[in-house]
Design a protein with these regions (language model features):
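AMP-forming adenylation/ATP pyrophosphatase catalytic core
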Residues: 1-84
Length: 84
């Protein structure tokens, strides 16, 4: 639980959305960066280069580049991307 392993935000590329279109950024969502991890409340923002920024309500442990971030709206999986 070292403080340097805590991240309050991440960037993600290679985005893929189940509905085929990105979800609107102005809504609250939850995200996971690890399998079986508890859903973490977050907000998203899209960057001009097509990537996404995810800002968590509380810092997340050991966010790792190259792994996936998966976005949810309640119980519905929206898609996600690769952490950069």
């Amino acid at each position: 639980d070292h403080p340097l392993l805590q991240r309050s935000s991440l960037g993600a590329g290679q985005l893929s959305w189940i509905a085929g279109v990105p979800p609107p950024p102005e809504r609250p969502y939850t995200a996971k960066t690890r399998y079986r991890q508890q859903d973490a409340p977050c907000r998203i923002a899209y960057r001009e280069d097509g990537s996404m920024r995810v800002d968590f309500a509380t810092p997340q442990w050991a966010v790792t580049p190259g792994q996936s971030v998966v976005l949810y709206d309640g119980e519905v999986c929206l898609g996600g991307g690769i952490i950069v």
